[in-house]
């Protein structure tokens, strides 16, 4: 049978939907899973920087592009509310506690604005294993009068007793990374939240290195706010992520973001889709005392919803969340730990000093090395091994596709420390 061009395109674009349905019913892929990703000559051990896009995510984005080019054979768009719900299930949150955000940093900024920083002043506690690119943000807040306290790391850890000493009465916010981008250290988030709440402080957690990589339970932790982008362990892409706000925490906070996704027409049904306010200024509009009538949407969307967002990324995120759910985070974590264990043993044998805590269960492993970038760039390039090189340390981050051959290739390429 010969297919017409339109039939062939339609069949190709329908494939992601069929694959998704089949995947839900079939056995999850075994790990390591190289088949779900494009073939490469590179031993890729840098998923903590950027996770490779899976073939399924690429097909899902291709299907979205077909719709945007008005292809009549394009499948229906991804249900965005269902994608929000999938993320909420992953981190044990309710869907209305979650909304879209451009990036992790934009989520953190939104929380700071909602709390009135810097204008209202007050005390913020953060630590030196938080995301290093957020450091200038807190330094600038300090310049503008906010009392910012830094908890220092010791041997690659932030000690709970040091957090307890820093979180004093009058603290308004504790801001941290659940899993540190520097070395994979993981906070006891529930314990930190208990310390903060005991003095009336709220807690924000950057979960970009936790969601999809280690079990996360936002409700159980008691954390007030959390945010993450999706281009790392959620296997999405740049430009869109999630912002979480615990139910009830927004009730006493002023509205600081005024975007049209946060408002809806009076009487509009619940949902996350666009609901333009009722106008009173155009011909044949109903009369009104103000230019528009609107209601505030409930939950995180009503407080943080702004304008349009990167909709082309949603199909990739949706596919990534389905993939993670099919395998299960515990299985993903266990596979990563198998790779990390072999890497840890091999690095120590070569004389490298590790700064990742020995009991960490995250998929990041960091070693200290003076002039690491200068010394390792050439041998790693020759061996076609990719990891995260910095001035005086390097970070390795295996994922679902990593196998022992990748590990052995890296260890073989590294000179003795």
What are these regions (language model features)?
Residues 6:
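Residues within the helices of the helix-turn-helix
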Residues 9-417:
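Pyridoxal 5′-phosphate
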